């Protein structure tokens, strides 16, 4: 059986070659994280079979499959590998890419991947471009896996080498999906292994974000570089797959029925893919906001004529979601005729993630309403949840104001120098923090998944000076922080209404 030597821990990993020649031992590498500690060998069969799961752009799938499947059949025959591809339109969440699972020897995995990479590169440049990110999808800009990854200075690395996978042509990228345990081996202790991979290959290697408080089953490795650089990096990554007994634990090629969060295909931004599986139904999004409708809110200031294409689809998807859980579109002041509204809702059916679009639409509404000065008067109707408006007003004596924002006063807002990141701090009464956290912290996790923002709450007993309020810090892009702030505000408003209707719950 083919095996690979682990990198020994000697305190100086950077620059240590990764041996591709098979030694006689399968001893576990010391840099493996705790969750990779199991010795159960599930990645290989009796014939030294391993698994490699990669993403293939939909535009390149046809050339890989060939007419009537002839190309892929011939490829399997020549390499001895088994190749499975997700069905047409069955894309990896948040992308238009199909999932390909390759099973075979190490040589077969490398050969098949080399063929796939070549086919992707052969596509015309006007087709093989980086997937666009919707302006309605909030993204954070956190350094992947909190590892300070600088492009290594190496004879194989030049200024022309890709330094940012988000701006690199898809033709020069490789995307590999690995179990969380394998991701730990690829990173290594303190990031030593991934740095060694970059130094030896000249490629840029990044992993999708590792979330706090919840474990993803898989993570996505993005390799960016010239063909030979990528080939070398993939060989080194396959070596780590070879070393991990759990590397064959996630062999699904369809994510249509996967429950729970799925790793983002991009190395920056939220750890989670922009997928309906994170929040599978409109009802789930409604639950985050509380049971309500938007009756009586101020007119929505957006002008739909300013949007086209995918943006319009995302917006109409949001409208569809809003309508599905009782929001009255006529009260939004969108200026849509009955016929236009019907058409918009029909178009929304094609959306992959209407729940997230709805949250962003609400965030946009909150932003626009605030900019127009509608919150200046502190009236309950501005952000009131319709039927809860009166109940919210009834709590004014307890919280000190009519606006739900008063229960989450803004302490301060900071922007990064390039304007790509905001940090918003708000104060929330101690007895309302539980509404934001949810049972076992579930609500807080869902808010972060939905918006892409990072939300932190000060520890119990740590209050804003002179108050009994806890500090909530929201970090992310302007869109992400706005969406998260709005969700928190609406949740607090809902809780206020519930407590006003049931005074025994207060305190």
Curated annotation (Swiss-Prot):
Name under which the protein is recorded:
RNA-binding protein Nova-1
Residue limits of the KH domain? 49-116, 171-237, 421-488
* Name of encoding gene: NOVA1
What InterPro entries does the annotation carry?
A: KH-I_NOVA_rpt1, KH-I_NOVA_rpt2, KH-I_NOVA_rpt3, KH_dom, KH_dom_type_1, KH_dom_type_1_sf
- Region of interest: Disordered: 1-44, 139-171
In its UniProt entry, the species of origin is given as: Homo sapiens (Human)
So what does this one do?
Functions to regulate alternative splicing in neurons by binding pre-mRNA in a sequence-specific manner to activate exon inclusion or exclusion. It binds specifically to the sequences 5'-YCAY-3' and regulates splicing in only a subset of regulated exons. Binding to an exonic 5'-YCAY-3' cluster changes the protein complexes assembled on pre-mRNA, blocking U1 snRNP binding and exon inclusion, whereas binding to an intronic 5'-YCAY-3' cluster enhances spliceosome assembly and exon inclusion.
Instruction: Supply the domain comment.
Output: The KH domain consists of approximately 70 amino acids and includes a conserved hydrophobic core, an invariant Gly-X-X-Gly motif, and an additional variable segment. The third KH domain (KH3) binds a hairpin RNA loop containing the 5'-UCAY-3' motif on targeted molecules. RNA binding by KH3 requires residues C-terminal to the KH domain.
> What residue spans carry the Low complexity bias annotation?
150-169
Q: Which GO terms describe its molecular function?
A: mRNA 3'-UTR binding; mRNA binding; RNA binding; sequence-specific mRNA binding
Keywords for this entry?
Answer: mRNA processing, mRNA splicing, Neurogenesis, Nucleus, Phosphoprotein, Repeat, RNA-binding
Q: Does the keyword Repeat apply?
A: yes
Coiled-coil segments on the chain, per record? none
Return the GO cellular component terms, semicolon-separated. cytoplasm; intracellular membrane-bounded organelle; nucleolus; nucleoplasm; nucleus
């Amino acid at each position: 059986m083919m095996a690979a030597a682990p990198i020994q821990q000697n305190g100086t990993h950077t620059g240590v070659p990764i041996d591709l020649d098979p030694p006689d031992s399968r001893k576990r590498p010391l840099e493996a994280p705790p969750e990779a500690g199991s010795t159960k060998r599930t990645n290989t069969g009796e014939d030294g079979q391993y698994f490699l799961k990669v993403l293939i752009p939909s535009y390149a799938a046809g050339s890989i499959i060939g007419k009537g499947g002839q190309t892929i059949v011939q490829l399997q025959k020549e390499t001895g590998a088994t190749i499975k591809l997700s069905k047409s339109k069955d894309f990896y969440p948040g992308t238009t890419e199909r999932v390909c699972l390759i099973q075979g020897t190490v040589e077969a995995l490398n050969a098949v991947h080399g063929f796939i990479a070549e086919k992707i590169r052969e596509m015309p440049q006007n087709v093989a471009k980086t997937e666009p990110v919707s302006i309605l999808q909030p993204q954070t800009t956190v350094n992947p896996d909190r590892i300070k990854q600088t492009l290594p200075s190496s004879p194989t690395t030049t200024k022309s080498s890709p330094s940012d996978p988000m701006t690199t042509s898809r033709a020069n990228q490789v995307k590999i999906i690995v179990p969380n345990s394998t991701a730990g081996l690829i990173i290594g202790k303190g990031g030593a292994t991934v740095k060694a991979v970059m130094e030896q290959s000249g490629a840029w290697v990044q992993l999708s974000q590792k979330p706090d408080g919840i474990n993803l089953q898989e993570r996505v490795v993005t390799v960016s570089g010239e063909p030979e650089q990528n080939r070398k990096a993939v060989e080194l990554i396959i070596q780590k797959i070879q070393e991990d007994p759990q590397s064959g634990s996630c062999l699904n090629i369809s994510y249509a029925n996967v429950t729970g969060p799925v790793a983002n295909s991009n190395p920056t931004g939220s750890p989670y893919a922009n997928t309906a599986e994170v929040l599978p139904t409109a009802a789930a999004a409604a639950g985050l906001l509380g049971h309500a409708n938007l009756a009586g809110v101020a007119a929505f200031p957006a002008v739909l004529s300013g949007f086209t294409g995918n943006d319009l689809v995302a917006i109409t998807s949001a409208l569809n979601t809003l309508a599905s859980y009782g929001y009255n579109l006529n009260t939004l002041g969108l200026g849509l005729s009955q016929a236009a509204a019907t058409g918009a809702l029909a178009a929304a059916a094609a959306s992959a993630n209407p729940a997230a679009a709805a949250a962003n639409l609400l965030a946009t509404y909150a932003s626009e309403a605030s900019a127009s000065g509608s919150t200046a008067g502190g009236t309950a109707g501005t952000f009131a949840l319709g039927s809860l408006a009166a109940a919210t007003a009834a709590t004014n004596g307890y919280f000190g104001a009519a606006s739900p924002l008063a229960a989450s006063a803004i302490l301060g807002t900071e922007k990064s120098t390039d304007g790509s990141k905001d940090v918003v701090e708000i104060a929330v009464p101690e007895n309302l923090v539980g509404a934001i956290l949810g049972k076992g912290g579930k609500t807080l996790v869902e808010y972060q998944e939905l918006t892409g923002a990072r939300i932190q709450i000060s520890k119990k007993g740590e209050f804003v000076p002179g108050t009994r309020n806890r500090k909530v810090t929201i970090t992310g892009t302007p869109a992400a922080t706005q969406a998260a702030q709005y969700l928190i505000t609406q949740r607090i408003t809902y809780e206020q209404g519930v407590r006003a209707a049931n005074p025994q719950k207060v305190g």
